[in-house]
From Swiss-Prot:
Alphabetically ordered keywords of this record: Cytoplasm, Endonuclease, Hydrolase, Metal-binding, Nuclease, Ribosome biogenesis, rRNA processing, Zinc
Main location: cytoplasm
Enzyme class: hydrolase
PANTHER family to which the protein is assigned, alphabetical: ENDORIBONUCLEASE YBEY, CHLOROPLASTIC
Protein name: Endoribonuclease YbeY
Family membership noted in the UniProt record: Belongs to the endoribonuclease YbeY family.
Localisation: Cytoplasm
Organism: Corynebacterium glutamicum (strain ATCC 13032 / DSM 20300 / JCM 1318 / BCRC 11384 / CCUG 27702 / LMG 3730 / NBRC 12168 / NCIMB 10025 / NRRL B-2784 / 534)
Gene name of this polypeptide: ybeY
Amino acid sequence: MSIEVFNESGYDGVNEEMLIDVLSFALGEMDIHPDAEASIHIVDVDTIADLHVKWLDLEGPTDVMSFPMDELTPGYSRPDGATPGPAMLGDIVLCPEFAAKQATKAGHDLAHELALLTVHGSLHLLGYDHVDPAEEREMFALQNELLADWYDNVEARGVTYQPKPSGAGAFPTAADRLELDEKMEADDSGFGGVES
C-alpha cells in the first residue's frame, strides 16, 4: 500500500505513522491490491467546514470526509475476485480538532478517534455508506471489526500506539455514533452539526 499523509492542520498530537498503519491494515483486510494508493489529509476546522459545504452541501465542520477516485471492490486475491491492478483509491480528510472534541465526549483519546475515523473513511472509499439502516449496521459492524482486529494485530507485532480502549464509545454502533453526533450538535463550541 502506498499511503501519503499531508498534515495541514497545525494540530499537535497526530501520529501520522499510526494513521498509515491503520489504513494499510484496513485496506489489506478488505483485500485491496497491495499496490493501491491512498492519501490522508489532516486539516483544520475551517478547511473541513468548507469541504463539507462544497461537497455535501452541509453547514459546519465534520470529523471525516472521503473522496473516492478509482472504483475498487474488495476481493483482489480471491480466485473469483476482481483483478484490478494498482489504483488510486482516493483521499480521506480528517479534522483532529473536531475529532478531539468527539473523543472527549465518547470517553477515549484522540489517537483512537482518529484510528476509528480512518477506518470509517477507508470504508467510504470502498463504497460503503450509512444512508439507510441496513447499510449503516453493516458499515459500523465492519468498521468495529477492522478496528478491533487492527489493535490485535498491532499488539501481536509488538507495536504500541495507544492501548486498546474499552467501553461502548470505543467501538460504537451506529446508534452510539448518532448519540455522539447529537451531543456535538448541542455543544456550544461553535462547531455546529456533524455528518460522518
